[in-house]
């Protein structure tokens, strides 16, 4: 499931993915950290290092271990239009085949 909304000069996009999907933690962290012009990135992922919650804002990059989630999900709030399909392809490339 994927959504994109634009309001008040910001673009918001989010993805919900099956709980059974497992992501490579370092590939995912690299992808999230290389994003540009974002206001907030928030997500929870089943990674090869356990379940992780990410909460990035301009003041802090924070991630931590969390209890198992109901699904994998991420939401990005950015200042400019974005190639969301490109981001989605890169996100799905972080997935580890089980």
Each language-model region and where it sits:
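C-terminal accessory "lid"/substrate-recognition subdomains
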Residues: 1-72, 80-85, 89-98
